[in-house]
Amino acid sequence: MKIAFFTEGNYQGKVNRNNVNMRTDLAWICALKADHWNINQKPDQKYDLGIVIIPKNNPQFEIRHLKLYCDKVAVMQEGPNWYWQDYPLEQQIWYFNTIQEADQMLVHNEIDKKYYEGLTGKKCKILPSLMIEDSIDGLKTTPRNDRDGVIIGGNFCSWYGGFDSYIVATYFECPIGIPSMGRKIVGEENMENLNHLPYMNWVDWIHALSKFKYGVHLMRTHAAGTFALNCAYLGIPCIGYQGLDTQMICHPSCTVELGDMESARKIAEKLRKDEEFYVYCCNEAQDGYGSNFIEPIFMEKFFNG
């Protein structure tokens, strides 16, 4: 099958397996040996399937243009399933009509599948998050005794729930790391015992993550779930919320109901105090990753699932 992805990315062609910025969208393109085109470009060839990731900040896209070059067109969910309802009304209607015109809707999680099937009346398909391991091979065997500290998955805003994650992380009684991201707010650097990682590419991020012993990501905004997935690949237990497939599949013993800070705190304390439970959760995470998210399983699900 000849596949093309259409996104707001300003590049054209294939994605090399050693790309240092191999986030999930690039991993999909790489694994499927697809071509990438900017969403505004006109391809110079025909495709069996075109997958379009409609930009969150520019949803007024017309699928009929892609149907000139692609036998079938699928829309890939971008962001949480409710995001589009913050658009002005005319853009909400435009987005709804766009996904109705698509031949297929691809989504992140089981809950998203139920949402979009109910919204559109069409069958939807989960496109699981993916890691291309070529550039990080060997990191998942990092000895656990060499790991220290807890890392939280996002900054201090409602989108990431960083303050909630920070409070739970304090119960590990160890240094707390946090990535520097686009929603970092003024004053974060003054929080006690909180160390910001510098901005870095994906490969450097996985290397940095591999040095931590625990993860906390109490993010209410459910989408691709890459933080939980990255932790699982490395065998790092990650405390997070239900509703995110990567969290629930790879870290079931560390998953809590939305907003259940009390249970999250208790899990943090148990991971710190109970070595047997910690090792169990490490193994559970890597087993969940290996049984559900490795590249061969992704390919099987995509073409035959």
What does each model-found stretch correspond to?
Residues 103-115, 121-138:
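Donor nucleotide-sugar binding/catalytic pocket of nucleotide-sugar-dependent glycosyltransferases
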Residues 87-105:
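Membrane-proximal helix-turn-helix segments that form the acceptor-binding/catalytic region
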Residues 272-305:
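A charged, aromatic-enriched C-terminal amphipathic alpha-helix characteristic of glycosyltransferases
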Residues 49-54, 64-85, 106:
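Active-site proximal beta-strand in glycosyltransferases
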Residues 15-24, 133-190, 196-202:
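Conserved catalytic-core segment of nucleotide-activated headgroup transferases in glycan assembly
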Residues 210-223, 236:
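Acidic donor-binding loop of glycosyltransferase active sites
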Residues 1-65, 115-116, 239, 253-258, ...:
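N-terminal pre-catalytic "stem/leader" segment of glycosyltransferase-like enzymes
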